[in-house]
Amino acid sequence: MTVRVGDPELVLDPYDYDFHEDPYPYYRRLRDEAPLYRNEERNFWAVSRHHDVLQGFRDSTALSNAYGVSLDPSSRTSEAYRVMSMLAMDDPAHLRMRTLVSKGFTPRRIRELEPQVLELARIHLDSALQTESFDFVAEFAGKLPMDVISELIGVPDTDRARIRALADAVLHREDGVADVPPPAMAASIELMRYYADLIAEFRRRPANNLTSALLAAELDGDRLSDQEIMAFLFLMVIAGNETTTKLLANAVYWAAHHPGQLARVFADHSRIPMWVEETLRYDTSSQILARTVAHDLTLYDTTIPEGEVLLLLPGSANRDDRVFDDPDDYRIGREIGCKLVSFGSGAHFCLGAHLARMEARVALGALLRRIRNYEVDDDNVVRVHSSNVRGFAHLPISVQAR
């Protein structure tokens, strides 16, 4: 069944602030009433059921990444790979890029980063816990992931606050803005210039960091260009920074609203990875990803023409009662396994999934070791407004320090 946007009963608008506040009732209706949805005004299609989203991730032949994964019109060009790297490529270009990047972005490098993540978490917690109440996003979750990326790629300590501010500006959207706004464009250009200078510096003086490893990566004489490395570093800001910030805040928010489950995590820190996984399922940071239909595609007896935009909705898929029991219950420790689609699937499975999970585990563990309990100030919570990322711009909490 296809429901068109002219139907006043059901409208999916990824730019709508009411949708950002709580998309899940919309998703439920889409899964039940319009598993293939058409929005004429915004000119996109969408699939919401777990099976369809999973197949969409896995079928990189029928569904192309070549124009990127954002619905924002300015982002959907054949040049998207210049800022979104492999996320805006199809094979064989995607496979080449991913193979070369993987030579530097290794599981071992991520494992060896864990002590630095713990130290960065300690530094930010030392500052935040000077008071009993603070904004968890502004003082911790919004700082740590970008600082981890900066640590990984070799950004000096003195530049990290500036880089965090630029990363925030790249992603911010005002109410009603359905494209990349000029301030985000300007921040993107400044960030790319900074990374170009960083790459040039490490080409002259290699160091023990990811940027130098990417410069050295080689496969049968093939190497990454400076432009390709720059695009990958920028991708980490988009795909690795913001999503992890939102994961941390989402975990803290939802556990606070399920105090019995939070108490079990406080009592047994081995449950922290389960806390992370259930948050990834229940309220994933990455809610909506776009694909371009590579050739006429038939779903639910409806033909989607070549060149059309099809949105995959992992935020909906993770709440599909066809796959998960009681999906609207936040239940730390539930069996999730390979059913999770928060990191995608197939050829484009998120290269940074292990980094995000490690960061969240380390950061939340560091927090719980420093406090006895916390509460969220619900009256002053502010959500971020983005067409594809879900989380909090401000999450004020009060804590009981140990």
Curated annotation (Swiss-Prot):
An example Gene Ontology molecular-function term: iron ion binding
Xref: PROSITE patterns: CYTOCHROME_P450
Keyword set, alphabetical order: Heme, Iron, Metal-binding, Monooxygenase, Oxidoreductase
InterPro entries with a match to the protein in the record: Cyt_P450, Cyt_P450_B, Cyt_P450_CS, Cyt_P450_sf
BP term (GO), one: cholesterol catabolic process
Cellular compartments per GO CC: plasma membrane
Cofactor(s) in the UniProt record: heme
SUPFAM superfamilies assigned: Cytochrome P450
Leading EC class: oxidoreductase
Alphabetical list of Gene3D superfamilies matching this protein: Cytochrome P450 (1.10.630.10)
Positions of heme binding: 350
EC number: 1.14.-.-
UniProt record similarity statement: Belongs to the cytochrome P450 family.
Name the record gives this protein: Putative cytochrome P450 123
Taxonomic source organism: Mycobacterium tuberculosis (strain ATCC 25618 / H37Rv)
Phylogenetic placement of the source organism: Bacteria, Bacillati, Actinomycetota, Actinomycetes, Mycobacteriales
